[in-house]
Amino acid sequence: MGIRIKGETMKTTLIIMAAGIGSRFGTGIKQLAKMGLNDEIIMDYSIYDAKEAGFNKVVIIIRKDIENEFKQVIGNRICKYMDVEYVFQSIDDLPIGFSVPEGRKKPWGTGQAVLCCKDIVKNPFVVINADDYYGKEAFKLLHDFLIEPHSNIDKFHMGMAGFILKNTLSKNGTVTRGICVTDEKDMLIGVKETKGIGYNKEGKITYENTISTLNENTLVSMNMWAGYPEFIDYLEKGFIEFLSKNGNSQDAEYLLPSIIDNLLQDNKAEVKVMKTPDKWIGITVYSFHKSAL
């Protein structure tokens, strides 16, 4: 929604979601796992690539209890080169009238994470996971998309990096991926969550314990989205609706892919899918972290 004017100077923000508990990682804080020869963490590479692509600011979403560690490991260093702000995601940061159900431990999901940025992010943005590496081209494509003019005031105008399936697969077992369905203009129709994707003995890509195969060049979503501040405003209304239905759940999450898919189905958003040749790297599990070194 809104009108972007050609030629106006536009600043852009990188939002990094780093508040997840990371229960599958097994040791330490996975977002701060050292990856490079000089003890770089995966965010170092993402922030460098984002700056090279033209992003001006970094907003890092974390838990309050790991603030000092984040600043020691990366924040105090990168603030010399980019504007950096921290936003805290808390399980009890809820709208008036709602409370945390007894026994719930995990945050409310990526939708709530981005919503936490409402008072901080006032520019076009790209949002990524802290523990994933997306590559240089993905940042460039989405940055250029954000600064292009558009005048559709009836729908949320968004972008998504489309990764080639074969560039996202793990050697450590099967994975779940969001298979993208697009039209002839590369506009997103929907994302189908597909489980159990991996190579069989013949080197073919299969899924969900079937003999059916997937094309290795199929585009998938790796949760790298581009949007504008009005989308964050919408998340506030959507979060109240989500809590009205799921507020007593121990594990229900307010997730960006589901939120955006609902907007697509209601014809309230348009999402441009930009194909990137970059290889995606993640450190969801500790063995995958070691294999990435």
Language-model segments: which ranges?
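Short, surface-exposed amphipathic charged segments that create phosphate/polyanion-binding patches used
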Residues: 96-107, 173-178, 287-291
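A short, conserved beta-strand element in the Rossmann-like catalytic core
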Residues: 22, 133-135
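Short phosphate-binding loop-to-helix
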Residues: 78-123
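A C-terminal functional module that forms or caps the active site or interfaces directly
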Residues: 236-269
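Catalytic beta-strand/loop signature of glycosyltransferases that borders the donor
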Residues: 219, 271-278
